[in-house]
């Protein structure tokens, strides 16, 4: 590693060799701390031994001059100011601290809270605080320095202080040990992490104070007697403490101190260079013009600069070697983040000394950190370097070595890190030509389509600088000229179309436009160029390119008019600013002014293509339609209405008809002055459609056979009327009654084609809804009963259609029926609408059963019933899945709103585990809502679901050997999920769980084998399912249930000759005393004092981490892991007593490896396998028939080598699993509804962060 020392400092080594300065001691301590036994260091990476050895050797060779400089003795020159009345030694002889003078022996400890409280409150600026402290220091150096030391101690959260006597008699390590013992905080918080408004700004004020302290001392005390060596030595010692507060605060102070010293060193370097130039200029003068006095003065000044630089570099070396080298791998991520952030500042401010591979490697290694804060600091530090083209040119070796890691971070699991990683690669793209390959860039291209807006926008900026800027930027100089350049705009459009086509995400133009909006918005809002390219006859665009260009035009119009990202894209912004709203209004007006005259031309040109017409019609949603009136554009409105009518008559596609109906709805608002003209055009269109429908319907009703053309014509007319009935009230045309007669004929005779039935069902459904909207309190009872009669008749028609042979008709009837039943449910009268009570409708039992049967046949399909999934495309499978999810959601709504009996939910709950991936979120939400409605009934429904599945399994497989079947294993998993659904509120659900157990026991013994038979009862295996709910029981309830089971077994006419297996399993589950919920509610309270907590799977995680090598060709030596918390002060005897668990016989922590006193394996219980006596002490922790074995532990840990039973270990693992699954239940599956979830499509796979630090 290159040294920070000047080569001219070598001649000072011998003269200062006998000096014993505190800085030298701290340096030696820092060098000793580099050994593997250094404490509190977390391994940075899991690298192979070869890579580690390679870096060790390289580091040794590179750092040789640095090590030599560290071994040099730093000699400070004497102070140049007049001596004080009481001279104080600059470097004390005793240990490494300043010894107060004799006159200060009886002085009290100076007030230490004034400075700390001032920094905490931030009442005044840091400069005034430092100036005030400097005045106190100049009056009494010892008291002033002691006040500064105690300020840092108080900043750590320690209430103890350092007294003058402690400085006299104790070393640094002894002082820190004393402070550690006195560190008796009430909570785990300290000033840097404490919550509350009083501590909110403490860290900023603390860092500003340290910065200002060095800044104010750089021209006086820093080189003139100030004991900075002692302060650095103290901070180095505190940074190696096991107390987190000491380590965190002192590291932050040392790093900020180092940053300030780097700035001072930079200034000294500049002054030194300036002095050298002045000296050379003076020396090059002629003998007559040369001034010897000035040469001598410049030489003295250069010598002073050289000495000052040596002192600063000595301090910097001590901090770097004593603090940074250890703490950048600290177990606390906040400490690691501070180190990485500051070294990035050093590289930017003093690049000549710090910007080299010897320092860059620390950032490169830490790119693999497990915590996002540390990775984020690494990426931001590198971004500051790569943003400077001069600095980036010196980072070629680092870029080549760590480029793959930086590229992989664009798919980081944390979106903030991924965003900064993409911005970092954008800087590399700008300032380092040819570094990123095509494969590297392709990994970023697809990110423009993901749901996270920040990531997509960053990726859009990368795409802009990679693809568009080199071509478009070369054709224009400024932004204004670029917008006016037709050639640059046309080039941009062609490049955008090429990129869009190659991406293979042709349905997501809105996402692409939103991603490029921030960096290329001026291009995308050039609607003149977009429309001119579409309307030109010789534009040489293919059909696919025209379609994409229209999608881009519509997407850019939507983005400008609405001002927010498309649906499904996550953004942290809540509202627009005033400036953004003003720009949005301006863009909306300009959009309408330009496109209103051109929209009829576009519709006329692309009217034959349904995929082009539908998006063009959506453009009306983004116009300011008042412009038709204010700017006298009525003639363009007439042309638009003509094109609308032609589109409706020409097309039958649902998306085109819906877009046309919605466009006409936007124009038919009464507040517009042209409303009468648009309403007349709408009436003409509907009259045309209704006349055609009446004629074609008469032909159908009078004839039993229609040719294909007649069926197609009638179907097309019904589709058009249905689409317009959705957006417009067509009640006055009275087309509902003819459609009802048509549907009745279809149900009675089956002679109506299914193509006609689908739109007819929808049309009648919309007519009922429009009638409901006209009802008010003044509506007569006769009108209400007429509406209900129509609704009941339509429900009967839909019920008949549920048994139709066409699946599309069945699904359409189910959806419409579910919606109507929900609308006319008892919820209809909520909110003071009692006048609607006559309309409330309750379905009959037959209808409820048919709805449940339909759900089983169309939603919960077995894998073989889904058809040939391999031959169908992925998007078809996804659409079918969404359709099934809609059907299930409709049925669940009927359950939750009281339309159907809640017991019918068992048909849904019993498929919870088997179809968890497809419908898990819907069923979980239904289960949660059902429990909120009726807790007791919901628990019975869960038990009913298990009973139904068990009964079905017996009917299929018979009662023998059920527990080994895959179906029974799935049932156990389902029972476990049901148990987890109760949540951690054990006391709240106590009665429900006990009731569930009792009902389950009754069911298991409800059917008995014939008298004299040795077979088990057919339902006895149900007890194994019931055992999954046992961890939710209290110990008292377990004992009661054991007694209840014993009584039930005693009623069996023939006692078994050997215990039944399910009974044994169930009894074992009831013998477990502690579980997760009970331990959390009944366990002893945690001590507030900080102590060491070693995770149970620490060794497993450590061993597993060794197998995950990053395959890097470099890596630092991994130090020995040590704790970072203060151990609880208790004797081994006390620990042993705590671990015994209670009085009574049992395994205990014996003095040797053999088993302690306690009962051995004895005979098991009687035939019923019921233990009726109360267990106490450690007997509750083990079954009498369980085998014992020993756990080999660390011999140095007292009280840890106790015996454990296999059952107790199983219990611990099971309860840990239950705790984790409880958390999963509580947090829910948030990604299931995401349009770009990691489990779908592969567009949002942000789960590739390589973790190389174990989480302790």
From Swiss-Prot:
InterPro entries: ARM-like (IPR011989), ARM-type_fold (IPR016024), Cohesin_Scc3/SA (IPR039662), HEAT_SCC3-SA (IPR056396), SCD (IPR020839), STAG (IPR013721). It is found in: Nucleus; Chromosome. Keywords: Cell cycle, Chromosome, Chromosome partition, Meiosis, Nucleus, Phosphoprotein. Residues 324-409 form the SCD domain. Residues 1-22 have a biased composition (Low complexity). Residues 1144-1166 have a biased composition (Pro residues). GO terms for molecular function: chromatin binding. One of its GO terms (cellular component) is nucleolus. Residues 1113-1125 have a biased composition (Polar residues). Component of the meiosis-specific cohesin complex, which also contains the SMC1 (SMC1A or SMC1B) and SMC3 heterodimer. Such complex likely contains RAD21, or the meiosis-specific related protein REC8. Interacts with CCDC79/TERB1; recruiting cohesin to telomeres to develop structural rigidity. This is Cohesin subunit SA-3. The gene is Stag3.
